[in-house]
Protein backbone atom coordinates (compact mmCIF):
# COMPACT_ATOMS: atom_id res chain seq x y z
CA UNK A 1 0.00 0.00 0.00
CA UNK A 2 1.16 3.53 -0.67
CA UNK A 3 1.46 6.28 1.94
CA UNK A 4 0.68 9.97 2.14
CA UNK A 5 2.59 12.51 4.19
CA UNK A 6 0.58 15.64 4.96
CA UNK A 7 2.27 18.73 6.37
CA UNK A 8 0.21 21.59 7.79
CA UNK A 9 2.41 24.66 7.84
CA UNK A 10 2.54 28.01 9.66
CA UNK A 11 5.26 30.13 8.04
CA UNK A 12 7.88 31.82 10.26
CA UNK A 13 10.55 32.67 7.67
CA UNK A 14 9.51 32.41 3.99
CA UNK A 15 13.09 32.19 2.69
CA UNK A 16 14.03 29.36 5.07
CA UNK A 17 10.79 27.55 4.27
CA UNK A 18 11.48 27.76 0.54
CA UNK A 19 15.02 26.47 1.09
CA UNK A 20 13.62 23.55 3.11
CA UNK A 21 10.95 22.69 0.53
CA UNK A 22 13.43 22.77 -2.36
CA UNK A 23 16.05 20.66 -0.59
CA UNK A 24 13.49 18.22 0.80
CA UNK A 25 12.03 17.52 -2.62
CA UNK A 26 15.48 16.57 -3.92
CA UNK A 27 16.25 14.39 -0.88
CA UNK A 28 12.85 12.63 -0.99
CA UNK A 29 12.93 11.78 -4.71
CA UNK A 30 15.20 8.70 -4.36
CA UNK A 31 12.63 7.25 -1.93
CA UNK A 32 9.91 7.42 -4.57
CA UNK A 33 8.31 10.60 -3.23
CA UNK A 34 5.82 12.35 -5.51
CA UNK A 35 4.47 15.84 -4.76
CA UNK A 36 0.68 15.67 -4.88
CA UNK A 37 -0.17 19.18 -3.67
CA UNK A 38 1.48 22.30 -2.29
CA UNK A 39 -0.59 25.41 -1.72
CA UNK A 40 -2.28 27.93 0.51
CA UNK A 41 -5.33 27.08 2.57
CA UNK A 42 -8.44 28.43 0.89
CA UNK A 43 -10.88 28.18 3.80
CA UNK A 44 -12.04 25.92 6.61
CA UNK A 45 -15.11 23.91 5.66
CA UNK A 46 -15.74 22.89 9.27
CA UNK A 47 -14.82 24.86 12.37
CA UNK A 48 -13.97 28.51 12.78
CA UNK A 49 -10.72 28.64 10.82
CA UNK A 50 -7.84 26.58 9.53
CA UNK A 51 -4.96 26.41 12.02
CA UNK A 52 -2.33 26.63 9.28
CA UNK A 53 -1.45 28.70 6.19
CA UNK A 54 -0.10 26.10 3.78
CA UNK A 55 -0.48 22.39 3.15
CA UNK A 56 1.84 19.94 1.42
CA UNK A 57 0.84 16.41 0.43
CA UNK A 58 3.50 13.94 -0.70
CA UNK A 59 2.87 10.36 -1.85
CA UNK A 60 5.37 7.57 -1.15
CA UNK A 61 5.29 3.99 -2.50
CA UNK A 62 4.85 2.66 1.07
CA UNK A 63 5.00 3.63 4.74
CA UNK A 64 8.36 1.87 4.85
CA UNK A 65 9.75 4.20 2.15
CA UNK A 66 8.30 7.25 3.93
CA UNK A 67 9.92 6.16 7.20
CA UNK A 68 13.18 5.39 5.40
CA UNK A 69 13.21 8.94 3.96
CA UNK A 70 12.25 10.62 7.26
CA UNK A 71 14.97 8.75 9.15
CA UNK A 72 17.61 9.07 6.41
CA UNK A 73 20.97 10.73 7.00
CA UNK A 74 20.25 13.01 4.05
CA UNK A 75 17.05 14.38 5.62
CA UNK A 76 18.28 14.94 9.19
CA UNK A 77 20.15 18.25 8.53
CA UNK A 78 17.02 19.65 6.85
CA UNK A 79 15.05 19.50 10.11
CA UNK A 80 16.94 22.54 11.44
CA UNK A 81 16.03 24.52 8.30
CA UNK A 82 12.42 23.28 8.58
CA UNK A 83 12.11 24.43 12.17
CA UNK A 84 13.63 27.83 11.36
CA UNK A 85 11.24 28.34 8.45
CA UNK A 86 7.95 27.10 9.84
CA UNK A 87 5.94 25.40 12.51
CA UNK A 88 4.70 22.15 11.00
CA UNK A 89 2.35 19.37 11.93
CA UNK A 90 3.39 16.37 9.83
CA UNK A 91 1.29 13.21 9.70
CA UNK A 92 1.37 10.01 7.65
CA UNK A 93 -1.43 7.84 6.29
CA UNK A 94 -1.41 4.43 4.64
CA UNK A 95 -3.69 4.46 1.59
Regions found by a protein language model. Give the residues of each.
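Short S/T/G/P-rich N-terminal loop/turn motif that feeds into the first structured element of a domain
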Residues: 1-73, 92-95
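Short, conserved catalytic or adaptor-binding loops enriched in Gly and charged residues
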Residues: 26-27, 81-83
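Short, compact, well-ordered microdomains
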Residues: 73-80
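C-terminal end-helix/capping segment
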Residues: 83-95
